[in-house]
Design a protein with these regions (language model features):
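TPR/TPR-like (Sel1-like) alpha-helical repeat modules
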Residues: 127-146, 156, 160, 171-174, ...
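TPR alpha-solenoid repeat register
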Residues: 45, 80, 113-114, 147-151, ...
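Canonical tetratricopeptide repeat
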Residues: 48, 83, 116-117, 154
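Canonical positions in the second alpha-helix
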Residues: 34-35, 69-70, 103-104, 137-140, ...
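Extracellular and organelle-lumenal recognition/adhesion modules and their flexible linkers in secreted
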Residues: 1-17, 171-178, 183-400
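Short coil turns that delineate tetratricopeptide repeat
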Residues: 38-41, 75, 108-109, 141-146, ...
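Structural signature of tandem alpha-helical TPR/SEL1-like repeats
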Residues: 21-33, 55-69, 90-103, 125-133, ...
Length: 400
């Protein structure tokens, strides 16, 4: 008889739990209330009941009671601890709130839980407790699953000292440093970016380096030559395409002049602007630029920023060959400075059906940056060109 009773009790328990599960899935206030009564040891039932009570405007005491039942049933249910913590904070019980949020962070090491605790410390001006939690959150490193920018922004509200933020909050995790560099550039905080760049280049993987290129571009656009060169050289020291670091005072600086590597389209490498009617293709240590006759009358088709010594005289050397491009068409090298526009040179239009050597003399501007451009300006009285040019063996020499 004892066995029969035990079997019956087991069947009853199974049926009761199955019915409770059915009621839980119905997801109404009434059904989940009954489910929690049938299975009081199920923490998820109590947590969901607390949520529905809140949504239905029920009293705070009933909600907290269900949350307490949830953590009693499962002390590692972080969501319930978080709700208890936030409710305690809302009623001015800061110590109880902190205790609950700390319990949540111990039970669940996910970013959202740590973010909630970091936010609590920020709201209560407890910076010494904020920094370790912020760093723990960022060390998770899964920036594809969450956006760390709000936490970066919180760090800058806690302190405006870039060194403090970098040392106390930003871990040596490549993806996190990459996102932090993106944040600094986007928020116009570039002056704080240089040490971040150095650490990102040191600790990041190849897939993390794109923000360094964007940062370098931003510095070039702002005319901050020295910092742009420093960022670029950090990439070169990392082994970027086998490129040599730039040192305009010691040697002429032109990158990838033999086109042995695909241009990265950033920094001090070649860029091929997107122009309707024009295509660029690297092939056989040459850069081929094709014009289909429908290109704009004025367009830049190949360019590179040069790091030059101020007021020094330079000679650009190159080899080229054209197909179906007439003399005097308006296709030539031009050199620009960010401050004053095009600078004087002895550049001539390019047209030669056989491979030939060309050169352009120019004097560097007062600044350190110049922009070398292969540019088309349709000559009056001519039709738009329909042909191609191959550029190779580009080098820059300083006049001794």
């Amino acid at each position: 008889m004892a066995g029969v009773a035990a079997l019956a009790a087991g069947c009853y328990t199974t049926a009761r739990l199955a019915w409770a599960d059915y009621l839980f899935r119905s997801d109404t206030l009434e059904s989940i209330t009954r489910a929690a009564q049938l299975a009081p040891a199920d923490a998820e039932y109590h947590l969901r009941l607390a949520t529905l009570l809140d949504a239905n405007g029920r009293g705070g005491a009933a909600i907290e009671s269900e949350l307490r039942r949830a953590v009693d049933a499962n002390s590692r249910l972080a969501a319930a601890w978080i709700e208890l913590g936030l409710r305690a904070e809302a009623t001015g019980q800061a110590q109880q709130a902190e205790a609950a949020l700390v319990r949540a962070a111990r039970a669940d090491h996910m970013y959202s839980t740590l973010w909630t605790l970091a936010n609590f410390y920020f709201r209560h001006n407890e910076s010494e407790k904020f920094w370790p939690v912020a760093r723990r959150a960022l060390r998770i490193g899964d920036v594809a699953a969450y956006d760390p920018a709000p936490l970066f922004r919180l760090c800058w509200k806690v302190s405006t000292d870039p060194a403090t933020i970098l040392e106390r909050a930003i871990p040596d995790v490549g993806p996190v440093e990459a996102r932090y560099l993106e944040f600094l550039v986007r928020e116009n905080l570039s002056p704080a970016a240089e040490p971040v760049t150095e650490r990102l280049v040191a600790f990041g993987g190849e897939q993390d380096l794109h923000p360094v290129f964007v940062y370098c571009d931003r510095l070039i656009a702002a005319g901050e030559a020295d910092r742009a060169i420093h960022a670029w050289n950090a990439l070169c020291w990392r082994g970027l395409q086998g490129y040599r670091p730039l040192d305009p005072d010691a040697a002429p600086s032109l990158t990838n002049g033999d086109f042995s590597a695909p241009p990265v389209q950033h920094g001090f490498d070649w860029r091929t602007p997107s122009v309707a009617g024009v295509t660029a293709e690297r092939f056989g240590l040459r850069m081929w630029i094709n014009f289909n006759g429908h290109e704009p009358e004025t367009c830049d088709v190949l360019e590179q920023y040069l790091a030059v010594a101020p007021s020094r005289r330079y000679r650009l050397r190159f080899r080229y060959q054209t197909d179906d491009i007439a003399a005097g068409s308006g296709l030539r090298w031009r050199i620009f400075t960010p401050a004053t526009g095009e600078i004087a040179s002895d550049a001539a239009d390019l047209a030669s059906e056989v491979e030939t050597q060309g050169s352009v003399w120019f004097t560097a501007p007062a600044g350190v940056l110049a922009r070398l451009v292969l540019s088309y300006r349709r000559t009056p009285g001519t039709t738009r060109i329909e042909g191609r040019i191959a550029i190779q063996s580009v080098s820059l020499e300083a006049d001794q």
